[in-house]
Amino acid sequence: MPIFQREGHLKYSFAAGEYQAGNYDSASPRFGQLDLIYGLPWGMTAYGGVLISNNYNAFTLGIGKNFGYIGAISIDVTQAKSELNNDRDSQGQSYRFLYSKSFESGTDFRLAGYRYSTSGFYTFQEATDVRSDADSDYNRYHKRSEIQGNLTQQLGAYGSVYLNLTQQDYWNDAGKQNTVSAGYNGRIGKVSYSIAYSWNKSPEWDESDRLWSFNISVPLGRAWSNYRVTTDQDGRTNQQVGVSGTLLEDRNLSYSVQEGYASNGVGNSGNANVGYQGGSGNVNVGYSYGKDYRQLNYSVRGGVIVHSEGVTLSQPLGETMTLISVPGARNARVVNNGGVQVDWMGNAIVPYAMPYRENEISLRSDSLGDDVDVENAFQKVVPTRGAIVRARFDTRVGYRVLMTLLRSAGSPVPFGATATLITDKQNEVSSIVGEEGQLYISGMPEEGRVLIKWGNDASQQCVAPYKLSLELKQGGIIPVSANCQ
């Protein structure tokens, strides 16, 4: 896709580390990378970046624009200097062109063309591999140009079809790498299925590779059953069947079981995985086996944010997040965020949020507990990309009380009188008296005094001391009678 950013906004990313190449005997150089994208007026975007390593340096400059009806385009150039084997230096440029267009008919077209203008240009990966082994295929298949085309057509209720084309050629080999893939995705009721075909011709092989596949998924309540079969040009077949789904009220416990069989002596294979999303992180355990192996794997992943109100553990963090604060509501859960719950300090992290859009954060009322009331059970935030925004929920921590208030003469306190808990705390607990002196009020301590006022004169106010009997609690509400004096 072409590269774009909203006008006046800057997006940046920085990475540093040690590069691990796919070739097992390749070097592992350390590197640093910085990328910048800035939104210009008139629907244009400027972007660039730099990558620095001991034996490789490159920088990129580019510009993009959305032309509306015509489509979106971005163009960039990369200048790179590589130190290869035997201290041999190589310099070159790479030019890239990206185009995308969506039509009202439901057609999406994308074209991405890459051309390396000189044979001296190497990507960071290519330079690392060639430096490790000058006689390897990494040097032989040094890309000169590549062109990609993607076409998708929506068919409404009948699904969609797609066609992908890719061609690469090389500086040190006359052959070309050609890849074609096409397929259809459809649905009958809740059952989804797909049919696909792919063809690949590599310059290092005389024959092409062809693969046909069929996949179908059937819903089973909170689980899915899946079947997939593939066949290549030599008649070799691979079949897989499996079941996956979720458990628990928040659907934060996931599982999958899969069994497969391949022809030509490969035999059976299978795997089973269980994953749990908790408030402080994710845990995954899995087992897999095949003809010549058995493997057990496990992982623990999470995030941590240090902020003005403490330290909060979370699930793995996304680019844009929401830090919610719900004082006193430990273990309260967030709607549509499996496993996210408030910790003992009253904080929680919603690890993913949509930038530049209104995100609604809601608490599950059934997870708040009888001693917590929230003034507004949902908040709305509009974060910028890469930001951590805070959503605060005002809470009342205490008992929910249905109080019957009687004056000294035995008559009920007047309808519409204000009732306020007498306390030295900053948060005010108040409510309005209903008919027959009935008062519902939350956030109340086990014992205290309530100031009742229905006017400004001393004769139009009184104080009602009370003490709750916790054993009388019914449905989370404690009834109590109090004399207002």
UniProtKB/Swiss-Prot annotation:
It comes from the Bacteria. It is found in: Cell outer membrane. It is a multi-pass membrane protein. Induction: Induced during the exponential growth phase. One of its GO terms (molecular function) is fimbrial usher porin activity. Keywords: Cell outer membrane, Fimbrium biogenesis, Membrane, Transmembrane, Transport. GO terms for cellular component: cell outer membrane. GO terms for biological process: pilus assembly. InterPro entries: Fimb_usher, FimD_plug_dom, PapC-like_C, PapC-like_C_sf. Its main location: membrane. Belongs to the fimbrial export usher family. Part of the lpfABCC'DE fimbrial operon. LP fimbriae may participate in the interaction with eukaryotic cells by assisting in microcolony formation. Could be involved in the export and assembly of the fimbrial subunits across the outer membrane. PANTHER family: FIMBRIAL USHER DOMAIN-CONTAINING PROTEIN YDET-RELATED, OUTER MEMBRANE USHER PROTEIN. This is Probable outer membrane usher protein LpfC'. The gene is lpfC'.
